[in-house]
Every structure is written in C-alpha cells, then in structure tokens.
A protein has these predicted regions:
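Extended, subdomain-level signal for the structured scaffold at the beginning of enzyme domains
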Residues: 1-100, 107-112, 129, 139-143, ...
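Small/polar loops that bind or transfer phosphate-bearing groups
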Residues: 7, 123, 156
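A short beta-strand/loop micro-motif in the catalytic core of glycosyltransferases
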Residues: 100-101, 121
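Short, glycine-/small-residue-rich phosphate/pyrophosphate-handling segment
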Residues: 115-133
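Active-site-proximal loop->helix
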Residues: 135-137
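Active-site rim beta-loop-alpha module in soluble metabolic enzymes
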Residues: 148
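A short glycine-threonine-serine/GTX helix/turn-capping micro-motif
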Residues: 151-157
Length: 193
C-alpha cells in the first residue's frame, strides 16, 4: 500500500505535513505496512508558502505506482491549475491510482483537470468561488471538513487535512487504527478561541 504526497513550491505547510504525520504514524504501527512517500515534479526541494523547505523522497517520474495520491493546497495550486503538464500528469495518475485525495485548494487542481465534474467536493472556505469558477458542475459542500466520494476524497482548508487523513486510516484499515493514530499524535481538537 503506497501513499504519495506531491509537494510543490508555495504548498501550504500543514496541508503537506498534517496528512504526512497522520499517515506516517499509521505506517509505523499498521500490519498493512503502508509506505508514505513525498515527491516533487523533478525530485528537487521545494519552498512552501510560509518558507519551510522540504526535500522530497523522489520525483514524480520515479515515484512508481501509488494506491493513494494526496495533493496538498496552498497558493502554489493557482499556477498548477493553468499548468498543462501538471494537469496531464494528474489525469494520468487518475487512470492508474485507485484513490485521489486533496487538501484545501488541492481540489482546485483536480477541478481544473476535469476530475471533479458532477461530483461532490470541498475546499478551503476562501476558495469556494474559485472551485465553482473552474467547474460549475462540482457539487460544492461548504460545510464538510472532508467529502468522501468513493475514489476521490477532498478536504476543506489546512487543518482539515488531518481529519481527512484520519478518515483514510479508518477507511483503509479500521476505525480502531485511526483512533490509535489520533491518540499517538494527541489530536483532540478543542480550539481555545
């Protein structure tokens, strides 16, 4: 079971490391032995939206087959929605990968690639109009933390990626496994404000 997280310049940090932490914690204890890898277009390091530098494991050409793709969001998704090479790659991955997921504005890339046509999806609250502009047929859920539509799971903004990743653990292994990961990362949201 291979999970790949694509990274790119101006990706939102928590969109990448939130799901990564959940999935890596799962991989450390699961009998399924999932492998979690990060990759960029060319394998080179990227600088995220707030300045964090990430060095991925590999390139998208060398990442190999995936069972799950996680596409983060952030300001870097805006150029990707117009990048014909990236969109063609996303479409190719769709044909070979059983489960596509996105965090935050990663869903904008999926919409631009035509992968959300007529499907329910969500994104960061501030990008709901952008999602509608990219594809008017998307059934936008403005309230959900994540939307599971079978072979595509989209999540709302930033921290919602953690919720979505815990959902993936529950879906791919069991709710008990997800609870164990949640306890391990001590995730019990009760915002102070």
């Amino acid at each position: 079971l291979r999970v790949g997280i694509v990274v790119f310049d101006d990706a939102e940090e928590l969109d990448v490391v939130g799901p990564y932490d959940v999935l890596a914690a799962w991989a450390a204890t699961s009998a399924l032995r999932p492998e979690v890898v990060t990759f960029s277009a060319d394998g080179a390091g990227v600088r995220c939206a707030k300045g964090l530098r990430l060095v991925p494991d590999t390139s998208r050409d060398d990442v190999g087959p995936l069972h799950v793709l996680v596409h983060p969001g952030g300001q870097g998704t805006r150029p990707l929605t117009r990048d014909s090479e990236h969109l063609a790659w996303v479409r190719a991955v769709r044909r070979e990968t059983p489960l596509l997921t996105s965090v935050c504005t990663g869903s904008l890339v999926y919409a631009a690639a035509g992968l959300l046509a007529g499907r329910p999806a969500t994104t960061h609250w501030s990008a709901l109009d952008e999602l509608a502009e990219l594809d008017r047929s998307v059934l936008i859920d403005t309230e959900a933390r994540y939307v599971d539509d079978g072979d595509v799971v989209t999540s709302a903004g930033v921290s919602a990626g953690i919720d979505m990743a815990l959902h993936l653990v529950a879906r791919l292994e069991s709710p008990d496994a997800a609870r164990q990961v949640r306890r391990e990362i001590q995730y019990d949201p009760a915002p102070p404000v």
